[in-house]
Amino acid sequence: MITLLKGRRKVDTIKVGILGYGLSGSVFHGPLLDVLDEYQISKIMTSRTEEVKRDFPDAEVVHELEEITNDPAIELVIVTTPSGLHYEHTMACIQAGKHVVMEKPMTATAEEGETLKRAADEKGVLLSVYHNRRWDNDFLTIKKLISEGSLEDINTYQVSYNRYRPEVQARWREKEGTATGTLYDLGSHIIDQTLHLFGMPKAVTANVMAQRENAETVDYFHLTLDYGKLQAILYGGSIVPANGPRYQIHGKDSSFIKYGIDGQEDALRAGRKPEDDSWGADVPEFYGKLTTIRGSDKKTETIPSVNGSYLTYYRKIAESIREGAALPVTAEEGINVIRIIEAAMESSKEKRTIMLEH
C-alpha cells in the first residue's frame, strides 16, 4: 500500500544529494525520493542542468562533488555515477560524514567494498546498496510462496535476465572498463535475489563471455551456484529475441513457473511515479503457475502476483536513518554479490569450479 507520500504529513525531512543524473539517477532514484515525505532532493551533481530543472525545479544543480560533501545540511548521498567511480565517490561521501546509498553493483571488487564498509563503520554512517529488484512483483511472489510452504525442499532454482540488444550501443556499460558488462549490470540483480533467498553458495561454476560482434565487454553469463542438493542457475544474454520463463523453481512436490518481468522500470522510464495502490501490479497474463503433486493428484493453479514496490527500499532507508532500524540491504550483502561476480569471472577464465570460503 502506498503511504507517506508528499503532502500527507510533516516529517523530519532527510536532505539528499544525488551524484549523477543518467538512467539511474533520473529513473530509479529521483522519482521515488520525490514522492516520499521523508526526503527532499537538495542538490544533484550533473552536467544535465536542463533535465534537472525540468524534473526537480527546487533542486540545485552542482558540478563538483565537494559542493555536496561540504554541505552540512545534506545527510544522505545517492551515488549513481558509472560503476567504476562508485568506490572513489562513496569514500569521499563517507569521509564527509554522509550516509550513502550506492547504485548496484556496489564496487568492482569485494576488497573495495570491504574497505568502504570499514570506513562507514568507523565514521558511524550508514552504507547500503540499491538492490531494488528484491521488490519486484515476481520475486516478492516467490518469497511469499516459500514462506507459506507452497514451495518446499527446493532442488532447482533457475532465473534468467535476457535482453534483445543485438547491436552494441555507445554506453559506458557496454564499453571495456571497470565493472562494465551485463554480469555486473544485470547479473548483480539476480545474484542478490538468490543470495537473499539461500545465502552464500559452496561453489560457483560459470561461463562469462562476449557474444555480439564488436562487443567490448561481457554480454552473456551463465552461473551455477552450488548449495549441495540445491542448484541455482542464473543466466542472461543480449541476443534473445523471445524470452522463456524468467523463473523456474522446482521442489520436492511443487514447481513454480513465471514469465514476464516486473513493470516498475518501464513505468518509471515513461515518467510515471508510484502515487497510488495500483503501482507495481503485474499483468494477469504473466501471473505464475504453481504445480503441486499430492500422491496421485496433480494440480496447477494461477498465482496472482504480489505488487512490486521499489518505494519500500527508500521507506526502510528513512527508518534506518531516523529510527535506527535495520538497513534494507547491508553493505555486506552488496559485497557478497561482488564476491560471486569475482568467482564467476575466475571460474570462466580458468574453466573450473571455484570453491568459496565462509
Curated annotation (Swiss-Prot):
Which InterPro entries does the record match to this protein? Gfo/Idh/MocA-like_OxRdtase_C, Gfo/Idh/MocA-like_OxRdtase_N, Gfo/Idh/MocA_oxidoreduct, NAD(P)-bd_dom_sf
Q: Which PANTHER family match?
A: CONSERVED EXPRESSED OXIDOREDUCTASE (EUROFUNG) (PTHR43708), CONSERVED EXPRESSED OXIDOREDUCTASE (EUROFUNG)-RELATED (PTHR43708:SF5)
What family, per the record? Belongs to the Gfo/Idh/MocA family.
Q: Which GO terms describe its biological process?
A: antibiotic biosynthetic process
Pfam families from the entry?
GFO_IDH_MocA, GFO_IDH_MocA_C
User: For this protein, what is any one GO molecular function term?
Assistant: scyllo-inositol dehydrogenase (NADP+) activity
* Gene3D superfamilies cross-referenced by the UniProt entry: Dihydrodipicolinate Reductase, domain 2, NAD(P)-binding Rossmann-like Domain
Q: Could you tell me the superkingdom of the organism this chain comes from? A: Bacteria
What is the name of this protein? scyllo-inositol 2-dehydrogenase (NADP(+)) IolW
Q: Which UniProt keywords apply?
A: NADP, Oxidoreductase
Question: Which gene name does the record give?
Answer: iolW
Q: Which reaction does it catalyse?
A: scyllo-inositol + NADP(+) = scyllo-inosose + NADPH + H(+)
Q: Name one GO cellular component term.
A: cytosol
Q: What happens when the gene is disrupted?
A: Cells lacking this gene show normal growth on SI as well as on glucose or myo-inositol (MI) as the sole carbon source.
Summarize the record's induction comment.
Is constitutively expressed, even in the absence of both myo-inositol and scillo-inositol. Is up-regulated under certain stressful conditions.
The protein's job, in short, is: Catalyzes the reversible NADPH-dependent reduction of scyllo-inosose (SIS) to scyllo-inositol (SI). Cannot use NADH instead of NADPH. May be involved in reduction of not only SIS but also various oxidized compounds manifested upon stressful conditions.
Tell me the first and last residues of the signal peptide.
none
What does the record list as coiled-coil region(s)?
none
Give EC number(s), comma-separated: 1.1.1.371
